[in-house]
Amino acid sequence: MTSLLFAFSLFLSFSVGSIFPFSTSNGPAVNDTLQNAIRSQRDVSKPIPIDRVGFSGVSLSSFFESEGYSSDSLSNLNGLLKENVDGVMIDLYWNEFTSKWQLCPAPFPNNITYTTASNRIVDVSWNNKTYKCDPNLSTDNIMSILNSFIRDTNTDVEANFMHVMYNLKSIHYEKSNQTISLENIYKEKNSNLNVVGMDTLNDTVSLLSSYIFTPTLLKQYQSTSNKYTNSSSSIRYIDSLNETQAIQDFYSQSTILMPSLQTVLLTQYKRLMVHVVTNDMAESSRSYQISSSDKDTIFFNSDLPASIFHTDNASADELCYELSDAYNRTDVNIAEFNKVSLNATLRLVVDDDKTPFTTKSLSKYVRCGYCPIFNSTEYSSQKVTEGNSSIISREFASNLFWSWAPGQPSGPDNCINCTRPTTNNTSKHSDDNGEEEEGNNIAYKCVALTEEGWEVSNCYEKYLFACQNKLSRNEWKLNNSTKRNYFDIDDDDCPEGYFFSLPRSNIEMLSLMTTVKQENVNYPIWIDLNDITVENCFVSGGPYAQCPYQETVTTDKFVRMIAPSFVVAMVVLVLIFIEKVFRKTPIQTNRKRYWKKAIQEYYAKNDYEGVPS
């Protein structure tokens, strides 16, 4: 019975493990290297204004066009969000017949019955095009997925900042005698009919309202920051500036004063912005009128301009060429880089089926300040499931980072195509007797800049090191005659007004790489980034900088962790209780009765009085 009980408990533990898994991921598992790259680039960018923090996004139009306008077409979205896709571009249509915002580009005939059944696909036509649309599909389907992802990642370690981008369009018709028949077909006849769609722009994102960084919050921040600037107008000496103050001072010169990623994400606990990046609504008396409530929630071009470029023309490449060649024999054209760094603009580059992104073009766009939006229908051709990552992740994961080289961050054993020194540049160190001897120490804990990007390198190697101007973030100095190992680098090794630092944005990164070309020095070059104190927690501030994170377990994760063990333990206790109370061993029962009867018969035959002699 005991062996049977053990076997049953073992079987039950496996069964419960399948019911209450430790991981409840509904999408592909993100590998550790990619996760570390995402988190470390986010951490490095914390002091940078949120509009200049790079991100990548997807256009949902490509999903809808290839699979139809239904909730099934959104099945890949959750998986993409886990793969470093932080933006969602949505084409939103104002239906002039119903006065509703909808996702389908065509109006629905008024004889369609609206039911709660999901995926009820119908063929609808408009402007000589036919679409497959679900009348029940609305922006709530998209926002529910975003809301679920935000709640699952709402910790200091996992939280990222996201963007919802609207392209506003119209389902428009000209009012005339000939259009009366159109109104009879598409205009709702029953005012009590529950037509799917949203009345206002604000309603389209209402599910995410508690997570949205709004124009109202921006105005409050600007008001507070202006008061602080006015109250602290005393002259600061350069030497007294810490890095955070230096970054704030530089970006306070921007065309629009924006808060940092640190302020929005980890102080105000806001996770996304909503932008109207294009407004192509037809001018009409039936057109949607943007309200003050919309303006309080959603960013328009008057609040934060958006510039959209397309891969099918050369306009996006012009800026990249200008910045890459912004140097001559004597110096780097810092003004060109500062003009981009201080211009508060959302720069987007969108591809298509004819000119999709390549790994080379994508890296170029990301490095020169663009946010790529994947719009080609080939990205939606394959389902994203557990163990089956998206095409974007498989082909472009390494190219979505302006910082890390492909395959990084990773140690020497797992590194692919890493730049490793071919000569022994390890430093000398003193032994216990104070004598200097050649060191053979190896510690792949420090980060160096290579031609491909950042790489984890041996801290004891002697490289050049990057010195950044405290007051001008795009101005760098590289002393070609001085090499140090990471532990020996000090701010005093940099020229006056400069300090040992690292790029914190794509433009700062490009300005440093341009300086390398202008000064004609060799890679690798040390930057102020390491994971010495805690593995895979990359921090700046020298070798003694501390990791800001502690291992945290959310309530949901804790419940999932203990549920299998708790259920198994309870079942085992119940079985033990049943065994003790209800079960009797027949052999033991018979033995007890036999000896009791034998003793009674013995005393009956040998009944004494007194003490036997």
Curated annotation (Swiss-Prot):
InterPro entries: Telomere_Capping_Maintenance (IPR051008)
Signal peptide span: 1-17
Extracellular-facing ranges: 18-557
Transmembrane segments: 558-578
Membrane topology (UniProt): Single-pass type I membrane protein
Cellular localisation: Membrane
Chain's role: May be involved in telomere capping.
Record's protein name: Maintenance of telomere capping protein 6
Native organism: Candida albicans (strain WO-1) (Yeast)
Gene it is expressed from: MTC6
